[in-house]
From Swiss-Prot:
GO terms for cellular component: cytosol; mitochondrial inner membrane; mitochondrial large ribosomal subunit; mitochondrion. PANTHER family: 39A RIBOSOMAL PROTEIN L50, MITOCHONDRIAL, LARGE RIBOSOMAL SUBUNIT PROTEIN ML50. It comes from Homo sapiens (Human). InterPro entries: Ribosomal_m50. This is Large ribosomal subunit protein mL50. The lineage of its organism: Eukaryota, Metazoa, Chordata, Craniata, Vertebrata.
Length: 158
């Protein structure tokens, strides 16, 4: 017999034995053994995760016929009859504004960033945005290409 003390109370615990084996071992023979479930694993090829996103090329030069392209898209989105001052058309309707900017982004390959969307109030603002050329050079590239004083040098390998 074994004695066990639980929080100050002494109880006697009997270990049942059936034909020389403890109770747990006796009844375990009658339990059905569960077969291990085998889960099929499907290997998917995943692209490697980049630590930082690749630099995107942002170079943009406005085309020569930008004004005529913009005018044709404005006619397509706002209707064929345009006033003489078509550049002063308001872009308050967000659906029309989206359609116009989406057509221009597809055609020119240059998208208006989210931070500048609220500044596009009139067609003139869109024309001014697309008239600005963007170079794909960093400030360090510009500094190394410019004429530097003799005491200033940019060394890329350090």
């Amino acid at each position: 017999m074994a004695a066990r003390s639980v929080s100050g109370i002494t109880r006697r615990v009997f270990m049942w034995t059936v034909s020389g084996t403890p109770c747990r071992e006796f009844w375990s023979r009658f339990r059905k053994e569960k077969e291990p479930v085998v889960v099929e694993t499907v290997e998917e090829k995943k692209e490697p995760i980049l630590v930082c996103p690749p630099l995107r090329s942002r170079a943009y030069t406005p085309p020569e016929d930008l004004q005529s392209r913009l005018e044709s898209y404005v006619k397509e989105v706002f209707g064929s009859s345009l006033p003489s001052n078509w550049q002063d058309i308001s872009l308050e309707d967000s659906r029309l504004k989206f359609n116009l900017l989406a057509h221009l982004a597809d055609d020119l390959g240059h998208v208006v960033p989210n931070s500048r969307l609220h500044q596009m109030c009139r067609v003139r603002d869109v024309l001014d945005f697309y008239n600005v050329p963007i170079q794909d050079r960093s400030k360090f590239d510009e500094l190394s290409a410019s004429n530097l004083p003799p005491n200033l040098k940019i060394t890329w390998s350090y």
